[in-house]
Amino acid sequence: MSLLPVMVIFGLSFPPVFFELLVPLALFFLLRRLLQPTGIYDFVWHPALFNTALYCCLFYLISCLFV
């Protein structure tokens, strides 16, 4: 249960989890952009699965901070 209120922007109601999804998405794009030049994706068996797991881990960490 989040303590953040429901946000209303231009008459559209957004639940708190919407913003909890946007913050890790921004961090994911930044982290992915930093990891690509390091060559870590050469050691990853399935890059799409790695990206999904990375986003899920970031979402979990951010949602723990918001609670």
UniProtKB/Swiss-Prot annotation:
GO terms for cellular component: plasma membrane. Keywords: Cell membrane, Membrane, Transmembrane, Transmembrane helix. InterPro entries: DUF1656. The keyword Cell membrane applies. It is found in: Cell membrane. HAMAP family: AaeX. Belongs to the AaeX family. This is Protein AaeX. It comes from Serratia marcescens. The gene is aaeX.
